[in-house]
Structure formats: structure tokens, C-alpha cells
A protein has these predicted regions:
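A charged, well-structured terminal subsegment
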Residues: 108-109, 116, 169-197
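Short, glycine/polar-rich helix-capping loops at beta-to-alpha or helix-loop-helix junctions
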Residues: 145-157
Length: 197
């Protein structure tokens, strides 16, 4: 039987290294939490997008905002994930192009002071970048979660959270963890409606 010990040790070493780097600078994460709380207070829409594994992260984050982040005696988040409506996505992809699937959906919803949260391991996905550009021109606030060099997210996003890794699996793992960190931080601002302890 082949031993996987070396690989597993190296894998966990990389995760530990990424976690140390992220935990040493939480300033951007604090800004994300504050921006989301502002959006909740003003009834602004928080829209999430992503492709592949990042699509599932986007959907998961919206689910957490809509339920896990419910606080007693406070407004609820208004949130929408654009990867959740498969018929609409395939309609735009089939009739126009895959690059337009998020941009065209945003035209139905996005307005000034809304928040667009984009997930992309590379920060270069064309359909994501096009959506960010439209949202920026609409006066929305842009939050990007990425990795590697950060790609286009570095320039276009108001806040760019970059996982310090070139491994896509590691990047995606940390994106969902960061979403849970943000949700947990929001839950500390009052009395959560639901207990998960």
C-alpha cells in the first residue's frame, strides 16, 4: 500500500501557513463585516456570484446571511445568489454567451449601494469580471474573494480578500471558511435567532 503520509503532512502544513497569514491581518475582513452590516441596516441587497466550486460557496454564503445571520430585534439581510436559478443561467448562456450570465441577471436587480460579493480562485473569470464592472458602474460596493495573484479583482474590487495560495482547492477551502468567519462575527453583534452550539 502506498503511504500518503508525506502528502497529507505537506497539505496540512500549507493550510496552516495560509491560516497564519490570514489571521495576522484581519483588517480587510473587519471591513467586510462592517460593510455587510451597513447593507443590512439600509436594506441594500447583497448579491453573490461564482463559478464551479465558487458557485457553491456563493450559494452557501447567501444561505448563511439569510438564516444563520438572523439576529433578534434586528433587520434581516436581503441577499440573492445568482448561481441558484439554473434556468435563467442557461437561458442567458444559450441565447447570448456564458460570459454574460451574471451581468445580465444583475441588470434586473443591482442598484446604488447594493453589495456584490464575487468568488473566483483566480480573479480572472470573464463572466465574474463583467458582472463586477456593471455593478461598479451602477454604484454598488464590490467585495472579492480570490487567490493566486488576485487577477482583475485587485483593481476593480473595493475590498479584495486574497488567500495566499496558488492551489485552487486550498483557495476554495479558505473561501468557505472565511464566509463562516464573517457570519460568526456578525452573530457576535447581538443575540442570534438560532443557536448552533
Amino acid at each position: 500500500m502506498t503511504s500518503h503520509k508525506k502528502f497529507l503532512n505537506n497539505y496540512f502544513d500549507e493550510q496552516s501557513s495560509c491560516l497564519r497569514e490570514l489571521s495576522n491581518n484581519t483588517t480587510l475582513l473587519e471591513l467586510v463585516v462592517e460593510k455587510l452590516l451597513d447593507a443590512r441596516s439600509s436594506d441594500s441587497l447583497v448579491i453573490t456570484i461564482g463559478n464551479g466550486g465558487s458557485a457553491s460557496t456563493a450559494s452557501h454564503f447567501t444561505a448563511d446571511l439569510l438564516k444563520t445571520a438572523i439576529m433578534k430585534d434586528q433587520k434581516r439581510f436581503q441577499s440573492l445568489c445568482l448561481t441558484d436559478n439554473i434556468p435563467v443561467m442557461t437561458a442567458w448562456s444559450n441565447d447570448i454567451s456564458f460570459e454574460e450570465i451574471f451581468k445580465e441577471q444583475l441588470k434586473n436587480f443591482i442598484k446604488k449601494n447594493d453589495v456584490l460579493v464575487a468568488f473566483s480562485g483566480s480573479g480572472t473569470s470573464k463572466n465574474i469580471v463583467k458582472a463586477l464592472e456593471l455593478a461598479k458602474n451602477s454604484g454598488a460596493y464590490l467585495i472579492g474573494f480570490t487567490g493566486m495573484s488576485g487577477g482583475d479583482f485587485n483593481e476593480i474590487c473595493d475590498i479584495c480578500i486574497k488567500v495566499p495560495s496558488t492551489n485552487m482547492l486550498t483557495i476554495e477551502s479558505f473561501h468557505i471558511m472565511l464566509c463562516h468567519v464573517i457570519t460568526s462575527c456578525i452573530r457576535q453583534t447581538g443575540t442570534p435567532e438560532f443557536s448552533y452550539e
